[in-house]
Amino acid sequence: MKPPIFIIIMSTVISGTVIVMTSSHWMLTWIGFEMNMLAIIPILMKKFNPRAMEASTKYFLTQATASMLLMMGIIINLLHSGQWTVSNNLNPMASILMTTALAMKLGLAPFHFWVPEVTQGISLSSGMILLTWQKIAPLSILYQISPTINPHLLLPMAILSVLIGGWGGLNQTQLRKIMAYSSIAHMGWMAAILLYNPTMMFLNLIIYITMTLTTFMLFMLNSATTTLSLSQTWNKAPLITSLILTLMLSLGGLPPLSGFTPKWMIIQELTKNEMIILPTFLAITALLNLYFYMRLTYATALTMFPSTNNMKMKWQFESTKKTIFLPPLIIISTMMLPLTPMISILD
């Protein structure tokens, strides 16, 4: 893709998200979602091959269905209230339709089926955008309508997402699918806390985006897409490989890494709201995520997968440019736990 075209498309993607976040009119919000969806599809098809086309088609069909449900919810709310203003005073039926539509856009279970398939079919850079930037707009609308969301709809979605996010990643060898299932689980954690402390949901989102962004950037630097290719990068770039493994443990929520911070704070907040079963279930299902990350770390760090390639050193090295943002991102993604008392004001 030529740089001027890429800049125009990325500007449209960013503009769509900003319009969704800043508009107070439901029609403008819907237009922002459409701008964002139509602009991201050429980015997903950047590598023009059948798998990318299939992934883009799946993404388009899912997002178009979600947009249709969102518009239905907007129209029902308009008929009930007579206004287009984005507010937390929604008709119950409109709230259910909007929550379902935004759950489809986010990839919350049971609408999660498109996330692993689409992520696997596109390039690492496109997957990075899909699993980070594309989560901001739907979550910002959920944040705005959180007082009217039906907990009997959202909390089962949250529990199912955390469960499927851990279960689905157990037998995966493709790194992009592992990141996709991790994304589903993290969205479940955010949905669980949304009804009780929406601000903490945004804190969780920031930490998740930072960790996922850093992990994908290191994957691109290492050209790693499978567990086999990751295990073969020790001779090529041992420092980057060890950083990837540390980040994966952070994504799994292993203390004392940064990924433990949002889980700790969410469980604490749910307990303060006299929820016992939900945080217990979330903590137990989070072990599934941690298990497959630790298994991947063990397999990569302490064993070597069978390979037909007998070369220990890859003769061709990737370019090491564009790493200026990596050091601060790596520090934030792994060492933020000591700063937790500073952000406890959100409680």
Swiss-Prot record:
<keyword id="KW-0472">Membrane</keyword>
<dbReference type="InterPro" id="IPR050175">
    <property type="entry name" value="Complex_I_Subunit_2"/>
</dbReference>
<keyword id="KW-0999">Mitochondrion inner membrane</keyword>
<comment type="subunit">
    <text>Core subunit of respiratory chain NADH dehydrogenase (Complex I) which is composed of 45 different subunits. Interacts with TMEM242.</text>
</comment>
<feature type="transmembrane region" description="Helical">
    <location>
        <begin position="323"/>
        <end position="343"/>
    </location>
</feature>
<dbReference type="InterPro" id="IPR003917">
    <property type="entry name" value="NADH_UbQ_OxRdtase_chain2"/>
</dbReference>
<feature type="transmembrane region" description="Helical">
    <location>
        <begin position="59"/>
        <end position="79"/>
    </location>
</feature>
<feature type="transmembrane region" description="Helical">
    <location>
        <begin position="178"/>
        <end position="198"/>
    </location>
</feature>
<feature type="transmembrane region" description="Helical">
    <location>
        <begin position="149"/>
        <end position="169"/>
    </location>
</feature>
<dbReference type="InterPro" id="IPR001750">
    <property type="entry name" value="ND/Mrp_TM"/>
</dbReference>
<dbReference type="GO" id="GO:0005743">
    <property type="term" value="C:mitochondrial inner membrane"/>
</dbReference>
<keyword id="KW-0520">NAD</keyword>
<keyword id="KW-0813">Transport</keyword>
<keyword id="KW-0679">Respiratory chain</keyword>
<keyword id="KW-1278">Translocase</keyword>
<dbReference type="Pfam" id="PF06444">
    <property type="entry name" value="NADH_dehy_S2_C"/>
</dbReference>
<dbReference type="GO" id="GO:0008137">
    <property type="term" value="F:NADH dehydrogenase (ubiquinone) activity"/>
</dbReference>
<comment type="similarity">
    <text>Belongs to the complex I subunit 2 family.</text>
</comment>
<feature type="transmembrane region" description="Helical">
    <location>
        <begin position="3"/>
        <end position="23"/>
    </location>
</feature>
<keyword id="KW-0812">Transmembrane</keyword>
<feature type="transmembrane region" description="Helical">
    <location>
        <begin position="237"/>
        <end position="257"/>
    </location>
</feature>
<feature type="transmembrane region" description="Helical">
    <location>
        <begin position="96"/>
        <end position="116"/>
    </location>
</feature>
<feature type="transmembrane region" description="Helical">
    <location>
        <begin position="274"/>
        <end position="294"/>
    </location>
</feature>
<keyword id="KW-0830">Ubiquinone</keyword>
<protein>
    <recommendedName>
        <fullName>NADH-ubiquinone oxidoreductase chain 2</fullName>
        <ecNumber>7.1.1.2</ecNumber>
    </recommendedName>
</protein>
<dbReference type="Pfam" id="PF00361">
    <property type="entry name" value="Proton_antipo_M"/>
</dbReference>
<comment type="function">
    <text>Core subunit of the mitochondrial membrane respiratory chain NADH dehydrogenase (Complex I) which catalyzes electron transfer from NADH through the respiratory chain, using ubiquinone as an electron acceptor. Essential for the catalytic activity and assembly of complex I.</text>
</comment>
<dbReference type="InterPro" id="IPR010933">
    <property type="entry name" value="NADH_DH_su2_C"/>
</dbReference>
<keyword id="KW-1133">Transmembrane helix</keyword>
<keyword id="KW-0496">Mitochondrion</keyword>
<dbReference type="GO" id="GO:0032981">
    <property type="term" value="P:mitochondrial respiratory chain complex I assembly"/>
</dbReference>
<keyword id="KW-0249">Electron transport</keyword>
<feature type="transmembrane region" description="Helical">
    <location>
        <begin position="122"/>
        <end position="142"/>
    </location>
</feature>
<feature type="transmembrane region" description="Helical">
    <location>
        <begin position="201"/>
        <end position="221"/>
    </location>
</feature>
<dbReference type="GO" id="GO:0006120">
    <property type="term" value="P:mitochondrial electron transport, NADH to ubiquinone"/>
</dbReference>
<feature type="transmembrane region" description="Helical">
    <location>
        <begin position="25"/>
        <end position="45"/>
    </location>
</feature>
